[in-house]
A protein has these predicted regions:
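Central regulatory/effector-binding core of bacterial HTH transcription factors
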Residues: 1-62, 132
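Hydrophobic hinge/microswitch elements
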Residues: 37-42, 46-50, 55-56, 111-113, ...
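A late-sequence structural motif
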Residues: 10, 14, 53, 168-205
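Flexible hinge/capping segments at coil-to-helix
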Residues: 61-100, 104, 191
């Protein structure tokens, strides 16, 4: 049995797919994935309620260790047929576009805040219409034509392939984030957990 926790970003996009593929290769293994906020995942790993955690922000905690797991590309998602679709746009163009943002504290939001600050742009300079708590909600808003959003590429891969969402690049921004693996300090890892980490790293590189 493998009990693993993930924050809402990777927990709603990458991890279900990787865990399902791992389970197909190891049909005798029962896998339980719980999805919650980063702090709760870290605390559960520290208390050894979960064997592993996967989070988008490494927050210091003396009961756990963080290690790089994979890089998550953040892109600007736009509705099909949008004027930004499949091209590079300037920050000035972005300022005039209705924007859907992840709520404050979300990993993707922090990445975008940092990138914009480095480019000399403040969020209040943009036309923010909605702030949402889940990447799935932001994806739905784009699908509904309510605006554009910065989102993990992995959250919209299927939509891009289906042609329902397109991707744009923003000149001067190269947003990505490190997704971290969380382990409990001093805990001997099971063979199943070791096998999963090895499989996931090879799958996500």
């Amino acid at each position: 049995r493998l009990e693993i926790g993930a924050s809402t970003g990777p927990g709603g996009t990458v991890m279900p797919v990787v865990l399902a593929e791992f389970q197909q290769r190891h049909p005798g293994v029962h896998i339980a994935l719980s999805v919650s906020d980063t702090q709760r995942v870290v605390e559960q790993v520290a208390r050894r309620e979960l064997e592993l955690g996967v989070v988008g922000a490494a927050r210091r905690h003396r009961g756990v260790v963080f290690e790089p797991f994979f890089r998550d590309e953040v892109v600007l998602a736009v509705p099909r047929g949008h004027g930004f679709a499949d091209r590079s746009v300037t920050l000035d163009e972005l300022k005039d576009e209705p924007l859907v943002l992840m709520q404050e504290g979300a990993g993707v939001r922090q990445v975008i805040d940092d990138e914009l600050r480095e480019a000399g742009v403040r969020l209040r300079d943009l036309d923010v219409r909605l702030e949402l708590g889940l990447q799935e909600s932001a994806r739905s808003a784009v699908l509904g034509g309510f605006g554009v959003t910065f989102i993990s590429r992995s959250a919209i891969d299927a939509d891009v392939e289906a042609g329902t969402i397109a991707v744009a690049r923003v000149d001067g921004l190269e947003p990505s984030r490190e997704i971290s693996l969380v382990r409990s300090v001093g805990r001997a890892e099971t063979r199943v957990a070791q096998a999963f980490v090895e499989f996931a790293k090879s799958r996500l590189q």
